[in-house]
Swiss-Prot record:
Gene3D superfamilies: 1.10.150.870, Bacterial DNA polymerase III alpha subunit, thumb domain, Metal-dependent hydrolases
GO cellular component term, pick one: cytoplasm
EC id: 2.7.7.7
Function statement: DNA polymerase III is a complex, multichain enzyme responsible for most of the replicative synthesis in bacteria. This DNA polymerase also exhibits 3' to 5' exonuclease activity. The alpha chain is the DNA polymerase.
Tree of life domain: Bacteria
GO molecular function annotations of the record: 3'-5' exonuclease activity; DNA-directed DNA polymerase activity; nucleic acid binding
Main subcellular location: cytoplasm
Annotated localization: Cytoplasm
Catalyses which reaction(s): DNA(n) + a 2'-deoxyribonucleoside 5'-triphosphate = DNA(n+1) + diphosphate
Protein name according to UniProt: DNA polymerase III subunit alpha
Family of this protein: Belongs to the DNA polymerase type-C family. DnaE subfamily.
Length: 1116
């Protein structure tokens, strides 16, 4: 008997179902169902993907939704809603939007809201969560009958069904009788959330994760009820209710939804005076052309503009361009900095004269066809950059312009990633945290990592998994839940604008700001035909804006970064030295190396290096550099290639060059050339053959030799995957150049602004401040009277602000600034009496003192000792002023400071690190500068010019990894007074020294300087010794206790001696013989080099508790 599954939750009922839509549809198809429903709870996330998957598989999609209907404050019931038609589908979208846009945490639709959209829907009162079953369980049969009759009266007698589930006849039969009595059709179902029974354990885990409980704490009635049943299983389970089975098919037959997918729904722009969009766009372009070019506007340029406009009009995109022009105009008028362009749109002259982009495509030989190809109808893709702190303003403007119901941001899903799935599964199963932590530490957090990949790559992970049954269970279940959606998030850039209310095509939900989110990802948005625009928040534009503002305020220079000279020697000198921290796209170690080798001296060099510095084309960077230097002869397969490739020294760098070659040599239009480029880049055999034939035939027709044409085609094929979009490269290189110019000419302003963008990232901030010092820019300490919220410039240097200090909030800083503006602060007592103690608390005051911000009020130890008394004094002052209504000023003599011993330099530094996260006024190593001279120690800065070095520094971070061979090695982040570096400790050296390494301690290291994969300098360590052992002559001794049992075994004693000799080194060994009560220091030949390997092997021989390393003072 044919039936249909009508109660199905997919993965989009978050953390409730194991049913991924492709597998769900495949399972239903394989089980020979003719139709399938989707009824996710409250949401329509999966409607379009489900519809597409069903259509592709030949299944009829039944689109529904499960929700809670609230009839009154104390009465509600779950209902299953199904779209009978496209109108019904639209009603589901609207109802889901109402539910998901509620302010309350509870999700429901009111009865009145449901009535507003009741038409074209079918309704099922579900077995679980339905009011009827609750009434039956409470023996309130009449209430249940009245409820059903109420629904029939208001929703339509033929539109309401009653659901039964499960095999318990005692629970199902009363519902059957009730249905018969009220003449309401009965339907039977599985509440499907699991496709395979073996996935039930994983299903329980995600329920536990969602509820925040342990699996063993879950209360599940009939777990079989959530499993996917075949047609036969459904027939067997509900054989007593054949009509209920048939009714599922009848319900499905009543549903007819046909979605229109892939058809663009272009929004309309309201033009003035009822002009057509085409006429208005043309008028704006003509005005913009005059502004951009003035007297330089020529017939050729006008022809290019006309051709572009003709394509835009023919493709129906005039409104689109006007919409983008309008909000870019708003951004300019609101003084919001905009990026020069992004992607292929920079190749459009229309975009340039409309001030959408700031890259002249004619000057840089950019192609419009790379953006909009008349030979290939596709939607335009204009991505726009704004400062990250002002992006929201533009989106809000768009919302107000087109209506709150026509603009939305795009949703994304956060999924259970590899490492997170292990942790969540482990927690749900109550596995000991240390077991889970060991496993998860071995799983890389890099993007794209999966548990299968991690398991295959990491031998240590495999060992841990196989070490226990519980570890294997965790891994098995984690692999099943991995990748399931866990929560919703907002796409970093995507915004949709619709001509019609969005809820006619897609459901919405609450977003983070004023603009809602689509209930569908980017793919779904495109499927339903909505036009996406990317509004990107770019931190580098924020930095640019900040630097320009500081330059104006500090130097009185009003810079227009869009009019900077592109041949500035100072800028290119900075780039040639690779000093590009903070410079967009040029910051990485590898890029700095390339810049140092290339020594760019034209803007075109920056564009080329931006295009080439990627996996694949990087191999051609040496060719480009040698061609530029003239150390390698540049050859061309044909002289006609020279005009196209000479600017890149014979290397095909850009996709546009491929298009130009095809146009020049094969007679292709630029649109056809773009199709060739796209086809070749996919590297599909048949397409490659077809394109080769077309290219060679065209080239021969143009008068080229067939053999030459074939060779040139082969060249194109070789570079097709490597070629970069030149329009994008030029646009982003423009921003890079602007930042480099500002850094070269206004370094203090640049560094102050850059530091202000990373004030809450201590590690990055510390490195940046060290670089500033190396560049000769003084970093002035925090100061109550001079510091601001962010970094500020002074004549002597850049002033450290108050915001990075621990516990110091913006409110507290404003309170402090207000106090100092009223009058100079005389003392700690004076300061406490003039600020609000609820905002500037004793904890805030302590942080200020420890960081040195209150040094102008006294010595740090003294100030710390007087905090409590200062706040008590402040209370007395404020109490008097309150009692007198502020009519009198209290003239009370401030108490004397409690006198204490001043802090030592090392104590000051320790307090600074506590308050700021790193050392501000110096480095602990400075105290040992003289003592270290005898060891030929170099500073890090001196060491960068040498190969073999001896350095001293503090270890800030220790990172331990396991190699592919399973050996352990480490990476140390170290610093001295001149900079920070990474030290690499390979397995053999690590085994010797790991035991003595601690974060926050000073060490003496020997090794060789080398450039790693990122081209950053790093130290390959040969030796690492604690500094205190070297300078204080503090030495270590190894103590071994030989018990009576061990002493009896001569062979074991011989093993100990052999082991000591194998690990010969400087550390003395002392043996205590328990039976004889005798202590003996072994001769020098038994002295050892301490390592984990040695200690572990000794523990095996004499017992862990009988191996002790201790320190002693060497008097010699």
């Amino acid at each position: 008997m044919e039936s249909v599954h009508i109660h199905v939750h997919s993965e989009y009922t978050l953390l409730s179902s194991m049913c991924r839509i492709p597998a769900l549809v495949e399972k239903a198809k394989a089980a020979q169902f003719s139709a399938l429903a989707l009824t996710d709870r409250h949401v329509m996330y999966g409607a379009v993907p489900f519809y597409k998957a069903c259509k592709e598989s030949g299944l009829k999609p039944i689109i529904g939704m499960e929700t809670t209907v609230r009839f009154a404050e104390d009465r509600e019931s779950d209902l299953l809603l199904y779209a009978r038609s496209n109108k019904g589908y639209e009603h589901l979208l609207k109802l889901s939007t109402i539910i998901q846009c509620r302010e309350e945490k509870e999700k429901y639709v009111t009865w009145e809201e449901l009535l507003a959209y009741k038409d074209d829907l079918l309704y099922v009162i579900p077995y679980s969560g339905g009011f009827v079953r609750a009434c039956l369980e409470d023996e309130a049969l009449e209430r249940g009958e009245r409820f059903i009759q109420f629904l029939k009266d208001h929703l339509g007698g033929e539109s309401v069904y009653l659901e039964i589930q499960g095999t318990d006849r005692s629970k199902v039969e009363p519902i059957n009788q009730l249905a018969a009595k009220l003449a309401i059709p009965l339907v039977c179902s599985q509440h499907i959330q699991v496709l395979e029974r073996e996935d039930l354990d994983a299903w329980k885990v995600i329920q536990a994760i969602r509820e925040g409980v342990l699996v063993e704490e879950l209360r599940i009635e009939q777990e079989e009820d959530v499993c996917f049943f075949t047609l036969t299983e459904m027939e067997q389970t509900f054989r007593a209710y054949p009509e209920a089975l048939q009714n599922t098919k009848k319900l499905a037959d009543r549903c007819h939804v046909e979605l229109t997918l892939g058809k663009p729904r272009l929004p309309k722009f309201q033009t003035p005076n009822e002009q057509s969009a085409e006429d208005y766009l043309r008028k704006l372009c003509e005005q913009g052309a005059k502004e951009r070019y003035g007297e330089e506007w020529t017939k050729e340029k006008a022809q290019r503009l006309g051709e572009e406009l003709a394509v835009i009009e023919r493709m129906g995109f005039s409104d689109y361009f006007l919409i983008v022009w309008d909000f870019m105009r708003f951004a300019r008028e609101a003084s919001i900095v905009t990026g020069p362009g992004r992607g292929s749109v920079a190749g459009s002259l229309v975009a340039y004269v409309l001030f959408i982009t700031d890259v002249d495509p004619l000057h840089y030989d950019l192609l419009f066809e790379r953006f909009l190809n008349p030979e290939r109808i596709s939607l335009p893709d204009i991505d726009l950059d704004f400062p990250d702190h002002r992006r929201e303003e533009v989106i809000v403007y768009v919302k107000k312009k087109y209506g709150a119901n026509r603009v939305a941001q795009i949703l994304t899903f956060g999924t259970l990633a590899a490492r997170a799935s292990v942790r969540d599964v482990g927690k749900a199963l109550a596995i000991p945290p240390n077991v889970i932590e060991k496993i998860s530490k071995e799983i890389s957090g890099r993007p794209g990592m999966t548990l299968v990949k991690a398991y295959n790559e990491n031998e240590r992970l495999r060992q841990l998994v196989h070490a226990s049954d519980e570890a294997q269970k965790v891994m098995k279940l984690a692999r099943k839940v991995e990748g399931l959606p866990r929560h919703t998030s907002t796409h970093a850039a995507g915004v949709v604008i619709s001509e019609q209310p969005l809820t006619e095509v897609i459901a919405l939900q609450h977003g983070q700001g004023e603009v809602p989110l689509t209930q569908g990802t980017m793919e779904t948005v495109e499927d339903v035909g909505l036009i996406k625009m990317d509004f990107l928040g770019l931190r580098n534009l924020t930095l640019l804006e900040m630097v320009v503002k500081r330059v104006r305020e500090t130097y009185g220079h009003s810079l227009n970064v869009k009019q900077l000279p592109l041949n500035d020697a100072k800028t290119f000198a900075l780039l040639a030295k690779g000093e590009t921290t903070g410079v967009f796209q040029l910051e990485s170690g590898g890029m700095r190396k390339v810049l140092r080798e290339l020594k760019p001296n034209t803007f075109a060099d920056i564009v080329a290096v931006n295009a080439l510095y990627r996996p694949g084309p990087m191999e051609f960077i040496p060719d480009y550099i040698q061609g530029k230097e003239g150390t390698k002869e540049i050859t061309y397969l044909h002289p006609d290639l020279e005009p196209i490739l000479s600017s890149t020294y014979g290397v095909i760098v850009y996709q546009e060059q491929i298009m130009q070659i095809a146009a020049k040599m094969a007679g292709f239009s630029l649109g056809e050339a773009d199709l060739l480029r796209r086809a070749i880049s996919k590297k599909k055999g048949e397409a490659l053959r077809q394109q080769e034939e077309a290219f060679v035939t065209g080239a021969v027709r143009q008068g080229y030799e067939q053999e030459t044409a074939k060779k040139i085609y082969e060249l194109i094929v070789r570079f097709a995957n490597y070629g970069f979009n030149k329009s994008h490269a030029v646009a982003y290189s423009m921003l890079a150049y602007q930042l480099a110019y500002l850094k070269a000419h206004y370094p203090s302003s640049f560094y102050a602004a850059l530091a202000s963008t990373i004030w809450n990232q201590p590690e990055k901030l510390e490195r940046l401040l060290q670089e500033m010092k190396q560049q000769g820019i003084r970093v002035l300490p925090p100061s109550l009277s001079k510091s601001d919220i962010h970094f500020s410039e002074e004549e002597e240097g850049v002033r450290f602000p108050l915001l990075p200090l621990r516990y110091v909030s913006v409110r507290a800083i404003r309170e402090l600034i207000k106090a100092r503006r009223e009058a100079p602060v005389r003392s700690l007592f004076d300061l406490c009496s003039r600020v609000d103690g609820r905002i500037v608390t004793s904890r805030v005051m302590e942080s200020l003192i420890k960081a040195g911000a209150l040094d102008e009020l006294g010595e740090r130890a003294t100030l710390l000792a007087n905090i409590e008394e200062a706040f008590q004094f402040a209370e007395q002052v404020k109490e008097f002023q309150e009692n007198t209504g502020g009519l009198f000023q209290l003239s009370v003599e401030e108490p004397e400071y409690i006198k204490v011993e001043p802090l030592t330099d090392l104590e000051k530094l320790a307090y600074e690190k506590e308050a700021v996260g790193f050392y501000l006024s110096g480095h602990p190593l400075l105290a040992y500068t003289e003592s270290l001279r005898q060891y030929d120690r170099l500073t890090y800065l001196e060491g960068t010019e040498r190969r073999f070095v001896k350095l001293a520094g503090m270890i800030h971070r220790i990172r331990r990894i396991r190699t592919k061979r399973g050996e352990v090695m480490g990476f140390l982040t170290m610093s001295d007074e001149t900079g920070e570096w990474e030290a690499v400790v390979f397995p053999a050296v690590w085994a010797m020294y790991e035991w003595g390494l601690k974060e926050g301690e000073l060490y003496f290291v020997e090794g060789k300087m080398d450039r790693g994969r990122s081209e950053e300098l790093q130290l390959l360590v040969d030796k690492v010794l604690p500094l205190k052992h070297m300078l204080k002559k503090e030495k270590e001794k190894l103590f071994l206790k030989i018990t009576a049992d061990v002493e009896k075994e001569v062979e074991r004693l011989n093993d100990i001696r052999r082991l000591l000799q194998v690990h010969h080194g400087p550390t003395p060994v002392v043996m205590y013989y328990e039976k004889q009560r005798k202590t003996i220091q072994l001769p020098e030949k038994y002295h050892v080099s301490l390592s984990f390997t040695l200690l572990h092997e000794l523990e095996q021989l004499v017992g862990k508790e009988h191996v002790v390393v201790s320190t002693y003072e060497d008097e010699s």
